[in-house]
């Protein structure tokens, strides 16, 4: 297995259905999609062509379901896709192509906000300020002792402070589309 895609999920079925339409057709025998249901147990999830793991209780943070995904992932490389975001129609093929061309410890990909009000072009972006785990492909060997903390916010920033080490690669294409979901954890931060 070359790639594991890990998606933490909690009560955003409408968004997830849009992601399924784009991502599910891209899945191959080299790629697994793991969706971690963080305590909402929606029946619709079981119809998706992915490994679904149902957690009994809501953890209240994205780190716990992401850690479950890391624990069961079989891919040599791992990436995270939030359930309320979208990916390009060639998301998987571009990542697999990069994996086949070279080895790396992590790979950054360009992304933009769905409403196009903000973007990150990795030709100019610096990995030391990358505070999100989506938009990054990680070599699983480098994550053996790296896990998310249980904070409600900034857990991905803390994760990346440890994980973004070693040989870096970049995919210049815009493969990831971030959605600022008004009901999501980031939008409701009261820091």
Regions found by a protein language model. Give the residues of each.
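Acidic helix N-cap motif at the loop->helix transition within catalytic regions
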Residues: 15-17, 41-49, 86, 90
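Short aromatic/hydrophobic "clamp" motif used to bind/position activated sugar donors
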Residues: 78
């Amino acid at each position: 297995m070359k790639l594991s895609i890990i998606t933490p999920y909690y009560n955003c079925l409408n968004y997830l259905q849009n992601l399924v339409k784009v991502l599910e057709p891209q899945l191959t025998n080299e790629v697994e999609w793991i969706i971690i249901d963080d305590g909402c147990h929606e029946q619709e999830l079981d119809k998706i062509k992915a490994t679904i793991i149902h957690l009994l209780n809501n953890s209240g943070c994205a780190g716990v379901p992401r850690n479950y995904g890391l624990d069961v992932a079989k891919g040599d490389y791992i990436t995270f896709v939030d359930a309320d975001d979208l990916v390009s129609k060639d998301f998987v093929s571009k990542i697999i192509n990069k994996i086949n061309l070279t080895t790396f410890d992590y790979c950054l990909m360009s992304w933009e906000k769905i409403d196009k009000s903000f973007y990150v072009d990795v030709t100019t972006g610096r990995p030391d300020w990358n505070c999100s785990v989506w938009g990054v492909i990680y070599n699983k060997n480098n994550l053996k002792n790296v896990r998310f903390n249980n904070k409600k916010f900034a857990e991905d920033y803390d994760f990346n402070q440890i994980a973004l080490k070693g040989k870096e690669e970049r995919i210049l294409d815009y493969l990831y589309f971030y959605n600022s979901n008004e009901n999501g954890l980031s939008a409701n931060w009261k820091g």
